[in-house]
């Protein structure tokens, strides 16, 4: 039809062409990946690395024209699959703040891969638990003159096993230091009790809560 004030009709005109074009694009359909998992927790190691299990996979394909453009499924007949090595990364390296692991390292491959983009599965819930720290009292030649009590005035020094790479030492506090007996004949050791971690030294920014002591009291030979 023709619009105007001349009462024109379609037959009064002839088109210059029976087809015309306009610029347009087709955007990629997003495919959903699933199948990866991580352990519910792991011990502190000073990094955000998480060990990934499972196999990344796409949803089952569907016939072109069916489903929706947002259903995450490839179309039957298209050659597209997942390639790469899945990497898991904690949101934080430290015990107090680590709550989730995100996945990365995957992409699409195949003749029709360019028609799609990949949506990696949602982060997994996971935590980091304290690493076990074992202190050993390194004082030698611990002794005192008999004073009728079990008190000891030593300042404990320690060596440690269980520090993660990059951490070099820990500062410990205690609530008591005492001989096992007060008498010369029976006194054989000093016990440092009520041990707790005050701070960690190293280049990992580790804090006391990233470690748990293997025991809250330690002994050293003494006379």
Give the positions of each predicted feature.
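Short loop/turn motifs that initiate or flank beta-strands
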Residues: 1-223
